[in-house]
Every structure is written in C-alpha cells, then in structure tokens.
Amino acid sequence: EREDYQQLILEYLSETNGYRIRKNTDFQPKLAMDTAVLMEFLRNTQADQLEKLERLYKDRTEETIINLLNNEILKDSRGLMDVLREGIEFDNGTTLTLLYRKPETSINKQAVANYEQNIFSVMEEVYHKEGERIDLVLFVNGLAIFTVELKCNTSGQSYEDAIEQYKQQRDAKTRLFKPRAGVLAAFAMDLNEVYFTTELKGHSTFFNPFNIGDNYGKGNPHHPDGINVSYMWEDIWTKDTLSFLLERIIYIKTKESRNPDTKKAKRTKSLIFPRYHQLRAVRRVLADVKKNGPENNYLIEHSAGSGKTETISWLAHTLATVHNSENQNIFDTVLIVTDRIVVDRQLQEAIQGIPHKAGQVKVMDDKSHSADLASALRGNTKIIVTTIHKFFHILQQDLLGKIKHKTFAVVIDEAHSSTHGTLMQAMTTVLSHKYENSDGDDNLDVESSIIEEIQKSGKQSNVSMIAFTATPKPETIQLFGKLNADGHKESFDLYSMKQAIEEGYILNVLDNYVIYKTYFELQKKINDDPEFKSITAKRKIARFIDLHDTNIAQKVEIIIEHFKNNIMHQLDGTAKAMVVTSSREAAVKYRYEFERYIKANGYSGIR
C-alpha cells in the first residue's frame, strides 16, 4: 500500500507538474546530485559559458564544473541556497547560473524562457549510502533539495514512524543530509499529516508540522479522495511554488551567542523553512495585492508560537517587489511598524537575514527621529523598519496620504499590544505611590490611537495596512478585517491559539494555573452613600487592596515557592510560569516584589 501511495505521487509529479522521473542509479551519493541532468540544464541554458570553459579545461570541463560546484556548496560561507541563488564563478571570470528565478514581470522574454528551462525531477528508492534507502528525493537542475519518507495509515503506520526512521535509521553525516549543503528539508508524511526538519541530529532532531490545520486545531481537513496531504504534490511541489520557496522564502539564519564561562563568541547557522500557515499568509496577501493593488487592509491573526517575526520578514521582502498584471511595481515602500520602544534585534536579524540588495533595508534605531523616518519615506528605500511611536507621529501628520505619488504597504507588528506611554506612567505611579491619582486605565494604547487617526482621515488610496496580532480587538477587526459571507468582519488569515497549543508551540496555561483568592468586605454604607458611585467606589477599593504591598507580598511568596518546588525543573530546566495581573502598574509592583523575595531568600536560577 505504501508503494501504491508512492506511485500516485510520482504519477502526479510527472503528468501534472512536469517533473522528470529519474532512475535511482542516476544518483551520486558523494555529491547528492544527478550530474546528467545538471549538465543537460547547463548545455540548454548557458552554451556560450560552457564553450569558454571548454577552451580552458578541455576534456576535463564537466569534471571541473562538478567539483567546483560541490566545493562551493560545501563551503560554510556558501551552502546550497547561496549557490542556487548566486551561481558559481571560475578562474577566468566565467559564471554559471544554477537556478533561473521566476521573473516578477513578463517584460523580459528571455528571463521568462530561462525560467521555463529549470528542470525539476524526482527519484524513488534512493540509496544515500549502502543499506539506507530514501522513498523519494526531489531535485532542481540535478541538485537534491528534498527527501520524503512515506507511511500509509491503512498499513498501521504513520508520520511518527517516518520521523523515527529519520532519527534512528538515517545517517545524518552523509552528503545528502549535510546541514545547509544537502537537502533543504526532509519530509515525513502519511495520508493525513506532514512534518519536516531542516537538519537531522539523530534522536534530538526536531520536526515541525507542515499542516493546514483542522477545525482551528492541528492536522488537516478531510479530503474527499481520502488523502488529506494531497496539497503537497498539488501545490507545494509544483514548479512555481518550489521556485517561490527557493528564491524568496528559504534562508540561512545566523545566530550569535556567548559562552557564559569562557566568554567566547559563537556563531551558529540554521536553515529556515516556513511552516504551512506562514507560507499561506504570505501568498494570500501577495495574491490579493496583485489583484487589487493597495486597495485593501489585511488582518493576520497569528497566535503566539506562530513564527510571526519570520512571516513579517518574508511578507515585507515579497511586497517590496510584487508587480501587478501591467508589470508595474505595486508598492514603492514597505514600512514595518513594531510595538517596541526600539526595534528589537530578532526582527532586525530576520529582515536583514533574507537576501536583498545593499541599501534596500533601513532600520530606524534609537538614534533616529520621526524626521528621519519622514525623510526615508520620501526617499527610495524599499523596506523601512520603525517603532510604532515614530509611526504614530507620521500618521498624525497624514504624511503617507500627502505623498500621493508613492504607494506604501504598512506592516504593523503585534497591533494589539502597543502602548503609548502607559508603561512609563505606571512606573512613575508605582515609584511615587500616587495610587489616588491614577485609575489604572490601560486602554490608552497606540492601537486605539492609530484606529482613531485612520478613521479621521479614512482609508488612503495609496496605503495598504497589514496588521499582525494574536488577539485582535473588535475595533481592529472592523478596521482591518475582511467581510465574510455572513456579513461579519474576520481575519484575512488565521493561525489559532488552539492550533499552536495542539502543535506544541505554546503551553496551555489554563491546564496549569493556580487560583489564589483574596477576600475582603465592602462596607454597606458605600451602597447607600450618595457621595459615591457604587461601581466606581468598589473598583477603587478593589484596586487599592489588589495593589497593597502586603497582599502582593503574600501572593509572591506562594507563586515563587510553588514554581521553585513544582515547575522550574520541568522542560529540562527551562520551564516558565505566567503571572497575569490586572494592570501594568500591578505588573511593575509584582516584578519588584519578585526580585526582592528572590534576593532575600538567596534563590539562584530563578529570574
């Protein structure tokens, strides 16, 4: 039955997607290549370049090309992705292209023709070493890019068996699985679910789901033909989608860390491949923008644990180059607006990490001012990253609407949580103990302010806003949401908290919470006293008790002792606890009491 499943995929790839089916004897394990297809691609597309090389290398031309290509792929500074995107160069200055990009426009007929010359192929039952056989290997221009291990649920096996096969029975040190030089992703599939990894590490290999989601949870919706993962060959492994992944999405992330003992800096590289919802969100927005231009706003409701930073980065880079049917660039500038006081390093690294031309990205750091942002918006920078506070000043001036000759895509990061001075106000209140002068109104956030400003000026015809949030307010849904068949506004793309929890990216805190009740009695005279509004009075008294030092100290003792004795050892010592407070002012007071209690008791390892 597994063999029938495999043949179904092969037939679709061949007959519908235009793949070539190659024999497993064509595979060269030490190179992770099908060199015959590689050389055919080069001869069909770059005959003049090959002629130059043949004059130099004579009858060793093919050998020289293959060896140089393999050496470049194996370089730590390059890898397969860089070689596919940038090609290779020889001593005489001759360059060879290994993958032709799909052009954004149809103006350049030769570029379109070159793209059509890319050769996608597939092999079954591939031996990457003696005794170890892979079900399917996918190639582009003779270079292996994906492996697939298939399992059939009707035979009593599932994707979990495929994952264990990768972990226990596949040598991660072979050329096919060498990190960043071998395949870009290894897929584990059954009839219902798909998982992938970008690096085999034996038993510690981590597999991500690549599933659509079912009823807001994990898995995939039921497919009439009984194969719920058919989107893999019907969509993901089509030439256009694979090209999009190779050209615009997959990238190498470099992370710097420092050994706490030796203080030595360490750089680690990892290949970033999207989860299904990330790719879906980017492509959905692109498709709608291509059709409608900067006409619409979009709400991307992605839960915590969704990989939002990468999704924003991919979307920004693709929006910066997207063209309409008339071959016109839709957006002159993409503006990424983050809710931090300063643009955080994680977002900067993700934006800068995706390959782009020099000068294409500008980050408004803490030394920049609103005037610098205004200047950049009037200039030619394609992607600008700024804080929501600088952007708010731009919005108040209606600057985007005034620059009518330019079009803007504004990507708002975490639209629900941005605050306009309320955190600092809470800090000041706590430190000065001015409880009576503050009602703790935490609703004065920038999201509301932005909505108010947009509603004042209306939707600008040259501005499209894409709001990312995990928990949108009703006003946010009304402003950014799309109209559904029932006449209600909803998110343009949704990755729910339920799915994130079921897929294991966030913990369900409701499964692990402890209730601590505070009892107090309101004097009856408040209800009868005309000098007081009952609700207001009760709120003030409740707030006074809630923020009282003694009350907080008692709760903090229980929280920390419970965490220390029951929680912190879990998840290999990385477990965390969440404390939900009634206001930002309360959060600050709890933070100070946590620090005081930990220090007073000499606890280490808790922060």
Residues of each region from the PLM?
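ATP-dependent helicase/translocase motor core
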Residues: 1-333, 342, 346-357, 379, ...
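Structural recognition of the conserved hydrophobic beta-strand(s) that form the central parallel beta-sheet
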Residues: 187-188, 384-387, 463-469
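Interdomain helical connector at the RecA1-RecA2 junction of SF1/SF2 helicase-like NTPases
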Residues: 228, 475-574, 591-596, 604
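P-loop (Walker A) phosphate-binding loop of NTP-binding proteins
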Residues: 303, 339, 582
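Loop/turn-to-beta-strand initiation segments
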Residues: 333, 380-383, 406-409, 461-466
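Inter-Walker segment of RecA-like/P-loop motor cores
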Residues: 352-396
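Conserved RecA-like ASCE ATPase "motif II neighborhood" in helicase/translocase motors
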Residues: 381-414, 418-429, 443-454
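Post-DEXD/H (motif II) to motif III coupling segment of the RecA-like Helicase ATP-binding lobe
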Residues: 420-509
